[in-house]
Amino acid sequence: MKIHHFLTLLCTFLPLTTTALTNSTPLSLLGPCYKRCVTKFGETKEQLTNAETISLEYDVSNNTEFSLCKLGCNSHEYTDLNLAAFRYGQLAYQKILTTVEDVPTRGTVLNDVFIVCLDTSFMPSNNSAPSAKRLLSGTVLLVLDEDVAKADNVFLIEVLARNADKSAVQVISQQWCYSSNCNITFNAPTEVSSFDVRLRVSTFDSNGQVGGINFSKWHNINQILTKTFVDMSLKSVVWKAEKAAANFVFNLTASDHVPACSLQMIYRSSLSSELLHRNFYLDHTLEVFVNNLDFDKIYTMQLAPSGTHDRSTPSLASAVIEIPPCRHLVDDYSMCAPPPVSSLSYNWNLSPTSEYELLIKWKLLNYMDGLNVTEELSIPVAYFLLNAHPLITANNEQCEKYEKIRRVVSYGLRELVFHVPDTDCNYEVEMTAVDTNQRISEVKKIQVFRFNVPPYVSFLQASDIPTSVELMAVVLATSAIFALIALFLLYRKRKRDKKARFQMYKDAEAGVSYDYVATTESLGSVVQIRSTNFRFEPVENIDGNIEAALAQQQKFEGGTMNSMFRTYYNLDHPVKVPAHMAEASSDEDNGYENIRYSYFGSELSDDVFEEDIYMTHKSLSIYCQDSPLTTPMAPIAPYEHFDDIPSHQYRNFQVHNFNERIEKQAYWLMATVVDVVRRELYSLKVPKDYTPETISAMRKELEFLRTLAPHGNCRRFEGVVIGRWDDLPRQVIGILIENTRGGTLRNYIAAVGSVFRNCSLATDHDSFASQQDMNSTQHPFDKLSTEADENNSKKVKIQEITDSLSIRFCQFAEQVSSALEHLHSAGSVHTRVTTLNIYLLHNYSDPFDMLPDQVVKLGNFGFAVQNSEDVVLDDNLQPPEVIKGEKYEARGDIWQFGLCLAEMCSLGDLEQSEVGTLKSGHDTFKNLPSTQVLRDAAKRCLSARTRPSASDLCGVFKSVNVAATV
């Protein structure tokens, strides 16, 4: 019989649907018909709300009879389906159509309409829906008039939408609601950036439409998707099930933001580091209870989207609440744990026969406005629990070996005598009260010392005084030795500084300066001289025949390495060495090496050897050494396994000392090398040790680089370096990479950020090069100076510099996006997209005056993979989905790129930037339109739900750069 009934419904579905579509039923008749179906077939069920109240709602889900009744309302002319519920719907429609009841129409039913919350999910494109859409689902709250019952009406909820120009409004969704709160679902296209929605609600009773039409306010789709703010406040704290419960309320009228429906409360007490979570779905009560809180504690509450487990994720709302003691929340003290014992004291029994007895006394007093009074407690206490712990005691090693003493004491007693294993030990006694419900009071502690003597006497007996004097003498002697060592180190430092200052004056008198030299190409001509104290010296002031001596390179903390030369120039007035500095100093003491000691060819004598930026080990010499025929470096693989890759002999390179890279899980060393045959600079990457893990990692990177197609914004793979290792010829011992002389993007950001935040990096007296003109007040980085230049031709404003810098960052962002697009299109992920792995191709001396063809390149493919199962991630670079246990995909690279964009927006000062409100170090830079584009892109990349692709970001930044060039 059931199978026959199912086949009957299935056979009648198609013609019935066709009839319903061809015969459109007016809403004025359909609404009251649905109301009668709900009254007839709907089931009333009790639902527990977030406010822990009972709500009576009509439940029509999975209700076949109600569905048939609705079908009868829509198909009032169809006669082939003879089911009672279907016929009831048809008869209800006919009665509404033919009967006009004399019932007064109600003027007001709804006072307001709210979108309580919305959750978003992504619907990918398919054959039926060529464009991707966002599915939004949430809760709607209908505020009824005071004397309107919840079950008196049904509601038609329509979702209206409009574009940015607000010229046309269309209905994108219609849904029926049978209660004052219900769920809605509608779609929003992903390609629309500015999209507003609102609700239109029509009300019906069993006779027709009532109360007019109500509207909610307009909400922008971007504000809905960001969900950055929720107005949350504490409503009350109550006693609940032996614990405290905090009731929070959310105010929708105070903000235009629409929160997510799936939320969680992340909280912890001030005395604990454990994070607790309370997941909930926001309902029409706009409240939530957080239960199982401890009394008399302070809690930090954070509201976040559901599924968030990272402390660094920005919260939608936060609050710090103080839970009062239990007795402040109840009228009956028997509902609380007993108060702690008071007047806890001890005495030793000094009788010769009872030397090991200890007497403990205590009282239990009542509450009175938070203070103890002399009245004994009237609430039922079952017993007292006493614990005595032996303490570590001087001159008695046995004390710490004794077991803890535990006694259960009847409630009627207020003192206890018990034996201890050793009276020469000190003890800590703990006392708690336990009531009939096994609730334990706070612990009261007291320390017990031998024979009631002061604590220090029990630890320092008369026989120990000589030992203590000796110990004090040792401590004083050790302190004196450390003080002498500190004074000696300070003296040596001051002596070195004095020598350096003397050499400065001596060289200044001779017309010598130690400068950073910037060139157009790796072997090109000198275009600018920047001395060590960041002062600029025009090239015209330098002797045309520059005699350069390669100096020991300066290593900055996380900074770039620029080559330093000793340059000679003509001084109009010789500089005298101060009298107090007039002492002998030889050239051997200045710490600089002469370049003639490292000549390997006349054409390369003035070339700049720039080490890789990730250097940690200081080297006393940077002589360029000839490579031997046999290399001590670990072989990666035989060359016949990679014979399709260009190879270069190791003996053809001049190699600097290898230096270790500052990065977790790095398996390689880096050095800058010179190919003496081709006269070009390269970066060489070699294994750092001989372990199988290192060799496997290097071989894995080589496999990746051989399949990666070249790209203009990826650091170019130049081939492999081969050599003999032991008795094995033609072994791959290193990976040759394009040399990038400009250092990392992080160093560039730090350089411009420090200028913006500090305005000046040096004072006038810091530079001996500026002594040609003692009245010069030139600031570091001339482009930021508001003074006129030497010819007073024009004034360069800060606004122009910040415009240029912001556009430069957008250009860099476009180039990195293009590199990521290239990687992702090949099915690969980088996994280390940071500003430390983005390199500037050309060198620069002034970060505000770089070459126009400056580009950035993405490098360090040591952890790049094509299979997401093989990803090895840095703990600090894990996107939210990976923390939740999902696979690392291309969107993880986008999240890391968002951190790079945030670093650009904040000019490297990430400690003062907040996710969602990224701030730069300079107001002018922060308020630029191009900086706003960077900031918006960073927010989109750091979203936990939806992120743009690399191609989308590339298009965004390209449009900004094209507009800047027009």
UniProtKB/Swiss-Prot annotation:
| One record GO biological process | establishment of mitotic spindle localization
Could you list this entry's UniProt keywords, alphabetically sorted: ATP-binding, Cell cycle, Cell division, Cell membrane, Glycoprotein, Membrane, Mitosis, Nucleotide-binding, Signal, Transmembrane, Transmembrane helix
Which cysteines share a disulfide bond?
Answer: none
Instruction: Give start and end of each Protein kinase domain.
Output: 656-966
What sections of the sequence does the record tag as coiled-coil? none
GO CC term (a single one):
plasma membrane
Q: Which domain of life is it from?
A: Eukaryota
| Annotated signal sequence range | 1-19
| Record topological domains on the Cytoplasmic side | 492-966
**Ranges annotated as spanning the membrane:** 471-491
Question: Which parts of the sequence bind ATP?
Answer: I662, E663, K664, Q665, A666, Y667, W668, L669, M670, K685
User: According to the UniProt topology, which residue ranges lie Extracellular?
Assistant: 20-470
Q: Indicate the principal place this protein occupies in or around the cell.
A: membrane
UniProt key word DNA damage: no
Q: Which InterPro entries does this entry report, sorted A to Z?
A: Kinase-like_dom_sf (IPR011009), Prot_kinase_dom (IPR000719), Ser-Thr/Tyr_kinase_cat_dom (IPR001245), STK_NEK (IPR051997), Tyr_kinase_cat_dom (IPR020635)
What if the gene is knocked out? 71 percent of embryos of mutant mothers develop into sterile adults with extra body muscle cells at the restrictive temperature (25 degrees Celsius). Low embryonic lethality (7-8 percent). Loss of lin-5 and grp-1/2 enrichment at the EMS/P2 cell boundaries at the 4-cell embryonic stage. Decrease in phosphotyrosine levels at the site of contact between P2 and EMS cells.
List the Gene Ontology MF annotations in alphabetical order: ATP binding; protein tyrosine kinase activity
Q: Which residues are glycosylated?
A: N62, N126, N183, N214, N251, N372
State whether keyword Membrane applies: yes
**Cross-referenced SUPFAM superfamilies:** Protein kinase-like (PK-like)
Similarity annotation: Belongs to the protein kinase superfamily.
- Entry's free-text remark on domains: The protein kinase domain is predicted to be catalytically inactive.
- What's its job? During early embryogenesis, controls asymmetric cell division and the asymmetric localization of P granules of germline precursor P2 and its descendant P3. Probably upstream of tyrosine kinase src-1, plays a role in endoderm development by controlling spindle orientation during EMS blastomere cell division. Controls EMS spindle orientation probably by promoting lin-5 and gpr-1/2 enrichment at, and let-99 exclusion from the junction between P2 and EMS cells.
Q: What is this protein called?
A: Protein mes-1
Mind giving the lineage of the organism this protein is from?
Eukaryota, Metazoa, Ecdysozoa, Nematoda, Chromadorea
